[in-house]
Amino acid sequence: MWGTPQGGNLSPLLANIMLNELDKEMEKRGLNFVRYADDCIIMVGSEMSANRVMRNISRFIEEKLGLKVNMTKSKVDKPQGLKYLGFGFYFDSRAYQFKAKPHAKSVAKFKKRMKELTCRSWGVSNSCKVEKLNQLIRGWINYFKIGSMKRLCKELDSRIRYRLRMCIWKQWKTPQNRIKNLMKLGVDKDTAWITAYTGSRIAYVCQRRVMNFAINKERLTKFGLVSMLDYYTERCVTC
């Protein structure tokens, strides 16, 4: 058997040792590049240049370093079509430059995990769900903080609060308990009664304005929930 196990701790170290000569070669040629272990992007000004550089660098890797280039994963593409280390790229017309952001696949993966952590049938307390959500949020933001994602954080915040409202509404269980808790949160008795006895599905009830008022951002923050937007704004590298 040849090579090292994929995903092992040793693989990135060995890749850096082997590809150090590649870094020197690309620097000597004056190329703009980013490399993490064996994952590399080379940036040039035109498609013609990109095809030429890809041929030459692939030849250098195979002939000088004795490594095999995986051509199924190697391609020439515009920045908008790239996914690199979980990031995607877009052109900011106001700044007139390309910027990084979480790739759509990374966002979808986050949403899937967030949905799992806010599943109403998961038999743990809501405080436990918030704790797990906070771990997810902090880890995700700390990784992607170099990207531009204020609007995305705002959208995800709204989605998280909505799903937590559904968890809380289910926890209240009976109409009497729901009326009592809504009134504690400042909802008048008539509105609380109508909301509690609406008979609608939880997903619909928790979209209503009364629920947005009763279980708002401030109250969920007091409950311990970390705001993605606030956490990102405090740590944003490009803001």
Stretches with model-predicted labels:
Residues M1-C239:
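Non-catalytic terminal/accessory segments
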